């Protein structure tokens, strides 16, 4: 199973007592949280598969800064001038420092098909900031110190083997 994460996970924070963002919603904040949650799910699924000897392979990947519709789809004449200029600046940054959608797909393809992709691995571009480049191992933005508090909120304990949450029932 390949989970598609994002560099947005680097700035993601999971608000456990407001997972649906009912109190305070911001689109990109919700996106960052969802991509961090995707990565956590992939790592925990790998841990569970190993623990229970399931014939399941869980690997995660991200495309770096790939020029896809997600980077341009929010341009709208209904937006204010400042918001449109900010969005246009982001589009140019993606063009200058990112890569094509086809190159962004390579880490995901690697995770799905390469025999050397390891279970529990996380892959992305190997260039500066993981924005572009050849396929390589990606940085996992899950500081171990976070998990004690996160596990306590979830009613469980932090796993020593992986940086994932183990919830006790």
Residue ranges and their predicted role:
Residues 58, 66, 123-124, 140:
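Compositionally biased, intrinsically disordered low-complexity regions enriched in proline and serine
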